Amino acid sequence: MFEEPEWVEAAPAIVGLRPVTTQVQAATAPPVKGRKRRHLLATLRALEAASLSQQCPSLPGSDSEEEEEVGRKKRHFQRSSLANVSKEVGKKRKGKCQKQAPFISDSEGKEVERTCHRQAPPLGGISAGEEKGKRKCQEYSYLHPTQSLNSVDQTVHNSRTSTATLDPPKSSRESASPNSSHTLSRKQWRNRQKNKRRHKNKFRPLETQDQVPLKASIEETEVPPAPKSDSQETRAGALRARMTQRLDGARFRYLNEQLYSGPSSAAQCLFQEDPEAFLLYHRGFQRQVKKWPLHPVDRIAKDLRQKPASLVVADFGCGDCRLASSVRNPVHCFDLAALDPRVTVCDMAQVPLEDESVDVAVFCLSLMGTNIRDFLEEANRVLKPGGLLKVAEVSSRFEDIRTFLGAVTKLGFKVIYKDLTNSHFFLFDFEKTGPPRVGPKAQLSGLKLQPCLYKHR
């Protein structure tokens, strides 16, 4: 009775969910009549739209099913190959992580797995979320270097395997962002740990009261080192003493040269202006004489002790009054400056003694200056007739001993004893025979002695 519409014949195709082109339906769709027909037509169109969204459109023909099957196999093969590649990369990374860090606990590993699963990249490559997740994993490995990241790397690779595309897998350096920190080698990790320990020790807090007694007891057993301050002060004091000694030696040489190269009056003025200069000269003189095998004052004192103690002695150039301290005789001490209360300060060419008032006159290393004749004439004046003149002088000052002895005899003396055996000084004994036999204007070249100058060192 009624003609059946064309959509009844097309129903089996809908049940099979076969792809139907929109152009054919648009061309063959008849005008819809009735409420029931409109409902069926809407259902048909909804099913067609759902099938079109899930399946890619293919050309009509008998080869569409074969092409779909080939595409499905191809995609399955690509996914399986990508899974194998990602597993190999995961194993390599797992081995590296096992070398770099020890074991990690299960709870912490699960938390890191959840974090990495959340950051898994979508299809089509590595996204910003994957980079962020990998950065978190690397920061976790840096903060906990004693724990491994085996489970983290495995979960990240599994998520990549499930969502991988046809693109080849990228290396870790290419996939990581430039800001993310690189995985540390074993040597770098050790160096970083050492730097951390050094930084801790630098800012270590002060020791508690309980630790101080323990440390003190340990230090008591050890031998305390010598304080540096004392050694430095000792060295500084030794250096100052050495420099002072050198300066004193230089000044002594200068004063000695002045005494031998000028008259006694100039030397007296020099020491009156600078009394410390005489003290310095005397110290230098004593330092030089100490090196001699025999002091000439000791030899003269030995001779005087063999004579009567009643003899009056005049010591010209007494110094520190060593001769007066060595004999029992009364001694008149004369010098350019006073180092002892017994010393009378004066010029040896003019001593405050009466004529013919002494029995012995002594010149012990004191014939200094250019006016030696004045000294010997003054000794002749104060000596009693037959008095004794003793002269001890440095051996190197004599050029011709006979000439010197001849000149002394012209001044009213005669030689009674001479000792030339000592290597450092000569000793002569003269007896007064009378007043000088020559006038004051007569030249006595034999009385000129060489100055006793010390070498510069």
UniProtKB/Swiss-Prot annotation:
Annotated EC: 2.1.1.-
GO cellular component: chromatin silencing complex; eNoSc complex; nucleolus; rDNA heterochromatin
Top-level enzyme category: transferase
GO molecular function list: methylated histone binding; methyltransferase activity
Feature: compositional bias, Polar residues: 148-165, 174-183
The entry's keywords: Chromatin regulator, Methyltransferase, Nucleus, Phosphoprotein, Repressor, rRNA processing, S-adenosyl-L-methionine, Transcription, Transcription regulation, Transferase
Assembly, per entry: Component of the eNoSC complex, composed of SIRT1, SUV39H1 and RRP8.
Record protein name field: Ribosomal RNA-processing protein 8
Gene field: Rrp8
